[in-house]
Amino acid sequence: MLKKEAERITGGLSAPGKMPEGSYNLPAAACQTGAKLREIPGTPCYKCYAFKGRYNFPNVKDALQRRLASLTHPQWVEAMTTLVKKKKHFRWHDSGDIQSVKHLINIFEVCKNTPATRHWLPTREAKFLKFIDPDIIPANLIIRLTGHMVDGKNATWWPWTSSVSTKTKTCPAKDQGNRCLDCRSCWNKKVKNVTYPKH
């Protein structure tokens, strides 16, 4: 499949400045768990960044909606494979989240089709992960279950987590211009938890 056709089908990739390479984002309003948490003070989703700044530009909103609509396209897996296959690192959902078990399984297929790419998928959709045995996750994909509360406890039933804290952090981005630079902890399965500072 040609790149132009892949972009037409999927809505194209996003390019968050913090990340080392591309990402794929969806509208934050479509987050199933996050949409509820956004109304609750003390959660990382409260006053969500994906409802501010450039995310409010009409062209960005349109692109997010195109990507959301593309998820059920019969060639979505093939198209995403075309766009991702030459990247060394890829982040799923710098905004938005998993929409269904089928969506998650399709992400698995993209990961299997791009074995040279390391994939990172942060999520708050624990209800979908409960259908998944961690042992069937592609070796080049790490799914980090993110805690629901700032300074809260991490899930113990899932092997990789991320959290937001007002007290500590392991993510160095804040100290280096809000960029990953050479850090790849989020993609590293040996790193069981990554803690981000509260925005």
Per-range role (PLM):
Residues 1-199:
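Class I S-adenosyl-L-methionine
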